[in-house]
């Protein structure tokens, strides 16, 4: 497939051909989208889902909450659409609001009708959704990659367009290199971006195996970095490191619950020794009471 140049598609959105001005233009995107175009109440049945929607996680629970909000407060931010030559309107931004409005039983929804061609719609949809705070890291990474490929942009140019640092853009784009199983853990928020960045040091089955351990044992980012480092230096000892980190996490949790210092040590015969340290005598009675309860 031939890559599209930056050209008219992005200019239609940013109203400029100068990359030096794109950051300022995108920073005021919300205002410009409100000011430009035609506001109208459209029949909900005349709207069609956009083909550039980066969001995958349209969970029933989230839609139900949004539908309840729309029932009580209405739609505050208009849905951005464009007219289709075949009739009806295509959603550029606001598909969740549209689906929730249908669920809430609305017949019409407020819309901002934009006059944009295909490439302009691609840029507008991707950038509007990338700038949303509730996209998960994997959705944002995939949307950034599509924006980059669609307009043949460098990491720096993508950063200028969306108003983020080049380092942030590069780190997000690297998430697309993760194994599919690890991506799913990130999409379902079983892993955070910090975990994923550490896991990028591993490959293939090893990456998946360690990611599953991290998610199951709810390791911190720091613990994940330690585990990955050990895997790279001595793969045969990775299991022991994982168990040590799990014991460390358990010790910390017990210390918080008992309000006392708790240490857990594995003995050579496979057993474990738990030590509870108290700095004041009267805390012993409190500890006994907690253990009895």
From Swiss-Prot:
CDD domains: SPO0J_N. It comes from the Bacteria. GO terms for biological process: chromosome segregation; positive regulation of sporulation resulting in formation of a cellular spore. The keyword NADP does not apply. One of its GO terms (molecular function) is DNA binding. Keywords: Chromosome partition, DNA-binding. One of its GO terms (cellular component) is chromosome. Transmembrane segments: none annotated. SUPFAM superfamilies: KorB DNA-binding domain-like (SSF109709), ParB/Sulfiredoxin (SSF110849). InterPro entries: Chromosome_partition/occlusion, HTH_ParB/Spo0J, ParB/RepB/Spo0J, ParB/Sulfiredoxin_dom, ParB/Sulfiredoxin_sf, ParB_dimer_C. Involved in chromosome partition. Localize to both poles of the predivisional cell following completion of DNA replication. Binds to the DNA origin of replication. Belongs to the ParB family. This is Probable chromosome-partitioning protein ParB. It comes from Vibrio cholerae serotype O1 (strain ATCC 39315 / El Tor Inaba N16961).
């Amino acid at each position: 497939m031939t890559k599209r140049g930056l050209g008219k598609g992005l200019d239609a959105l940013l109203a400029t051909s100068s990359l030096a001005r794109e950051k300022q233009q995108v920073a005021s995107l919300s205002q410009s989208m409100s000011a430009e175009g035609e506001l109208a109440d459209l029949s909900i049945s005349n709207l069609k889902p956009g083909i550039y929607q980066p969001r995958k996680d349209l969970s029933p629970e989230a839609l139900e909450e949004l539908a309840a909000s729309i029932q009580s407060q209405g739609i505050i931010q208009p849905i951005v659409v464009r007219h289709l030559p075949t009739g009806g309107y295509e959603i550029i931004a606001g598909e969740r609001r549209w689906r929730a409005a249908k669920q809430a039983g609305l017949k019409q929804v407020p819309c901002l009708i934009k006059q944009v061609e295909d490439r302009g719609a691609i840029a507008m949809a991707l950038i509007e959704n990338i700038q949303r705070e509730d996209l998960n890291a994997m959705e944002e990474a995939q949307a950034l990659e599509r924006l980059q490929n669609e307009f043949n942009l460098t990491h720096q140019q993508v950063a200028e367009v969306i108003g983020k640092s080049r380092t942030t853009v590069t780190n997000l784009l690297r998430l697309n290199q993760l194994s599919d199983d690890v991506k799913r853990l990130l999409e379902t928020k079983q892993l955070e971006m910090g975990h994923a960045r550490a896991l990028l040091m591993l490959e293939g089955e090893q990456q998946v195996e360690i990611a599953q351990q991290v998610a199951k044992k709810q390791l911190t980012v720091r613990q994940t970095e330690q585990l990955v480092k050990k895997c790279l230096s001595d793969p045969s000892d990775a299991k022991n490191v994982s168990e040590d980190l799990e014991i460390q996490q358990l010790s910390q949790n017990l210390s918080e619950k008992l309000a006392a210092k708790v240490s857990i040590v594995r003995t050579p015969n496979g057993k474990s020794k738990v030590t509870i340290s108290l700095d004041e005598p009267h805390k012993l009675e409190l500890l006994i009471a907690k253990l009895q309860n």
